[in-house]
Amino acid sequence: EIAFRNLRQPKENTGFVANYIDAAFNNCIFMWDSAFMLMFGKYADRIFKFQKTFDNFYSHQHVDGFICRQIEEDTGNDVFARHDPASTGPEVMTWCEWEYYLNFGDKERLSRVFPCLVAYHQWMQEHFTWRDGTYFSSGYGCGMDNCPRLDEKYHVCYSHGHMVWVDACMQELNACNLLIKMAKELGREEFIPELQQE
């Protein structure tokens, strides 16, 4: 009942392309919240295509692969600048799309979203890693803004604190493994060596 009260249609001039479920928080769609709502929504797929909520993130993907984790519903604007440690993540869309594929076998959708997911992962690898290849994030960026892990001089929601974030590393490792599975399923083996190397 709560979910169906929060179904939305795209507003004009927002760049949104599909009906979606809203987190009912602050007139924004959120990558993290959407992923978990879609995990539950898949059980009502015959009534409403909850998975298409992600299409509104893909339609806002920047040319270099970046996808903001929070997008305003009224304007379609990204809430955060791309290199802000709180701008994106966690990389849960890959996991959610794979789970959807396992449930419904929708290869057309998997084929359509795979390039978006690979480009997003490549952006994360390029811009959210330290020199040794480990990942950083922020409380908002990794979805764990209530974990007291930073020194007091850093803001838990917005700062990376110059640390390696083990949860961000594990999220990216999971995404790599799932992208490899997708590549095999779709016959896109050209992506596998780079993903395996990471």
Name these PLM-found stretches.
Residues 26-30, 82-103:
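C-terminal capping/lid segments that line or modulate ligand- or cofactor-binding pockets
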Residues 1-29, 48-52, 56:
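Low-complexity, Ser/Thr/Pro/Gly-enriched N-terminal "stalk/linker" regions
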